[in-house]
């Protein structure tokens, strides 16, 4: 059998190790495919690396794609039509996991929700694992998993799109437009998300945010459907939160509701929420310079999350935004700015003019910067002119990072380095 692994980051490497362990595939010829021409692979493993890495997909019997590679890629679909079987690292994990899986999806907040839920469940003494973008690749956990364990898994639209199984417990956060550069339209994006509930069994549960697309996804569940309403929760209160923003409170309510359904005591939930300090690059406090507080929200890659960041503060603020465009509409951000404490905007990156046009006609002055260094300097200068006792500089790009950086983490680390040098 000729097998290809599509992508050779941490997930692809874990997939290779899993195939080497699996007696079904032990004798297969495995080839690694990766865009990066400097990709290094183990001995006895073939590699096709560089710009032409997708040119001969039809030669394989089976292709495992890693989470970051879209199922609807034209060359992958062409190979599929010619009879090549296409699976994924996530699908392999669902087929082989011996224990219950809790899956969380949504447009943003997945990492925060999964991590907080993990922190809550850890306090009960249960054997629980966190996997996905945060934690280990899920397939790397397979050798150690046992029947009574729990795995909490962050699931993106790319991972869910061709999944034919659903987690026993699903959490659906708010869904709004994203990845429109990789999905044909919003309908395809939301239909991909629906796989988190579509294959559930009658004893399974789906928790969902009470918003339009989230309700639509949840309706496919065959088990119990639970609407999660922050305004009605008695488990936690906004005052219990150490991280700013009502969007973070909504994430915490989702994690708390799922934990409560697993019989976690209310006080255990509340203690974990109070101790939770959030995740890196998600409205992360960096430092205070004079009376100016700097926040890193580099994980914000669409206008809705940037809008949420702007609504999270009470002190006057400067917003730094911009990056690689994903065919998204910035009207949401423009509307949020009108009702927020943001008094100045600094735009940089590939789509800075697109964002500026969306903001035109608003009452918030904006300026351009040619680099992140220049953007931070301009934002700091503007914030120092505010008369309030404290002010904030919010780095919430609302766009992808690939125009100037490796990824959002690289972008966030660069921002923090610049701020610490002030």
What annotation goes with each model-predicted range?
Residues 30-35, 206-210, 320-321, 341-350:
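Short internal beta-strands
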Residues 19, 63, 104, 133, ...:
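Residue-level signal for inorganic ion chemistry
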Residues 20, 54-58, 67-224, 377, ...:
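Phosphate-binding loop of NTP-binding sites
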Residues 9, 36, 134, 210-212, ...:
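Residues in the short beta-alpha loop(s) of Rossmann-like NAD(P)-binding domains
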Residues 41-44, 331-391:
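C-terminal helical cap/extension that packs against the catalytic core
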Residues 42-52, 60, 83-84, 99-102, ...:
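Active-site regions of enzymes building and remodeling cell-envelope glycoconjugates
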Residues 1-88, 92, 244, 367:
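N-terminal leader/targeting and accessory segments in enzymes
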Residues 12-18, 127, 241-342:
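Nucleotide phosphate-binding/pyrophosphate-handling subdomain across enzymes
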């Amino acid at each position: 059998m000729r097998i290809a692994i599509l992508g050779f980051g941490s997930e692809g490497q874990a997939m290779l190790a899993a195939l080497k362990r699996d007696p079904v595939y032990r004798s297969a010829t495995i080839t690694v495919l990766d865009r990066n021409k400097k990709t290094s692979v183990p001995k006895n493993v073939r590699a096709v690396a560089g710009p032409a890495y997708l040119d001969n997909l039809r030669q394989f019997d089976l292709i495992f794609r890693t989470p970051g590679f879209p199922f609807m890629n034209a060359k992958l679909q062409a190979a599929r039509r010619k009879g090549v079987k296409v699976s994924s690292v996530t699908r392999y994990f669902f087929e082989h996991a011996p224990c219950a899986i809790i899956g969380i999806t949504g447009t943003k907040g997945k990492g925060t929700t999964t991590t907080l839920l993990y922190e809550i469940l850890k306090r009960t003494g249960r054997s629980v694992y966190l996997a996905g973008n945060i934690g280990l690749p899920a397939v790397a956990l397979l050798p150690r998993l046992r029947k009574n364990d729990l795995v909490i898994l962050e699931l993106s639209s790319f991972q869910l799109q061709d999944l034919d199984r659903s987690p026993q417990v699903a959490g659906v956060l708010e869904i709004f437009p994203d990845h429109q550069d990789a999905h044909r339209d919003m309908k395809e994006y939301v239909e991909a998300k629906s796989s988190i509930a579509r294959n559930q069994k009658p004893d399974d549960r789906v928790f969902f945010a009470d918003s339009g697309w989230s309700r639509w996804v949840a309706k496919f569940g065959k088990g119990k459907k639970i609407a999660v309403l922050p305004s009605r929760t008695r488990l936690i209160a906004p005052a219990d939160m150490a991280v700013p923003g009502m969007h973070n409170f909504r994430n915490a309510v989702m994690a708390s509701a799922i934990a409560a359904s697993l019989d976690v005591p209310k006080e255990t939930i509340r203690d974990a929420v109070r101790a939770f300090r959030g995740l890196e690059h998600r409205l992360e406090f960096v430092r205070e310079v004079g009376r100016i507080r700097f926040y890193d929200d580099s994980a914000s890659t669409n206008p809705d999350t940037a809008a949420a960041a702007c609504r999270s503060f009470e002190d006057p603020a400067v917003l730094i935004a911009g990056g690689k465009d994903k065919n998204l509409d910035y009207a949401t951000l423009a509307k949020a700015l009108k009702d927020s404490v943001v008094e100045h905007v600094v735009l940089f990156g590939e789509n800075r003019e697109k964002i500026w046009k969306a903001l035109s006609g608003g009452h918030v002055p904006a300026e351009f910067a040619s680099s992140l260094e220049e953007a931070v300097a301009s934002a700091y200068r503007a914030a120092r002119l505010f008369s309030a006792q404290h002010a904030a500089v919010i780095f919430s790009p609302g766009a992808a990072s690939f125009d100037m950086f490796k990824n959002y983490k690289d972008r966030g680390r660069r921002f923090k380095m610049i701020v610490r040098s002030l």
